């Protein structure tokens, strides 16, 4: 099939319509010409999100939930997700914002926008304190386990007995849970087999 006549006719119609638009454009009033010539505003105003703080990691959903005040959060089956607001343009960050000035701030969970916001300050520092506290408790437990009892006397022996009982109890509970899961699995398989036999019989 030859496309040349189709293309030629389309070009002819397109170029024939161009002078008519130029004539119509000349008939416009001077006021309309001024409106056309005025440049559009360079940047449109976009709403800024009010942030209480900025998280060191966006994977920390609790921190993001705490810091971003104007996001509508929706509970989905898998996770909590932001809903409704598109992300506005981000302001350019300076070099001092990118590079941390103090080495002590690197371990913080987040950085507060206002230094006087005590609730934010406590939230951002809490994670670090809890981590330190849990490591201290773990260290104390390990230290107590490794310490010989004759120096501390009956109290140490009693503590070790209690810890041993707790461990045995936890092991017994986990074993009973495993056993109940095995029994439930066997019952499900038995029921499935009986159902297959019943279906084949009918």
Swiss-Prot record:
- Provide this UniProt record's keywords sorted from A to Z: Cleavage on pair of basic residues, Disulfide bond, Secreted, Signal, Vasoactive, Vasoconstrictor
Q: Which family does it belong to?
A: Belongs to the endothelin/sarafotoxin family.
Hey, what's the signal peptide range on this chain?
1-25
Q: Does the keyword Acyltransferase apply?
A: no
Q: Name one GO molecular function term.
A: receptor ligand activity
Tell me the disulfide pairings in this chain. 53-67, 55-63
Using the UniProt record, give the first listed, main subcellular location.
secreted
Q: What is this protein called?
A: Endothelin-1
Q: Which InterPro entries match?
A: Endothelin, Endothelin_toxin_CS, Endothln-like_toxin
* Region ranges (Endothelin-like): 110-124
Kindly list the organism's lineage: Eukaryota, Metazoa, Chordata, Craniata, Vertebrata
């Amino acid at each position: 099939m030859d496309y040349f006549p189709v293309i030629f006719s389309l070009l002819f119609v397109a170029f024939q319509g161009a002078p008519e638009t130029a004539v119509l454009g000349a008939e416009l009033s001077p006021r309309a010409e001024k409106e056309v010539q005025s440049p559009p505003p360079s940047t449109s105003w976009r709403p800024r999100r009010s942030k209480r703080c900025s998280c060191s990691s966006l994977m920390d959903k609790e921190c993001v939930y705490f810091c971003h005040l104007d996001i509508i959060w929706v509970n989905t089956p898998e996770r909590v997700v932001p809903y409704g607001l598109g992300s506005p343009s981000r302001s350019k960050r300076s070099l001092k914002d990118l590079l941390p000035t103090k080495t002590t701030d690197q371990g913080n969970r987040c950085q507060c926008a206002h230094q006087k916001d005590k609730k934010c300050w406590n939230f951002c520092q809490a994670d670090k304190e809890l981590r330190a506290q849990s490591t201290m408790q773990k260290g104390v437990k390990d230290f107590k386990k490794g310490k010989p009892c004759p120096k501390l006397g009956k109290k140490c022996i009693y503590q070790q007995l209690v810890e041993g009982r707790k461990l045995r109890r936890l092991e017994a509970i986990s074993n009973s849970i495993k056993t109940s899961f095995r029994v439930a699995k066997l019952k499900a398989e038995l029921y499935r087999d009986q159902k297959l036999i019943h279906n084949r019989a009918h």
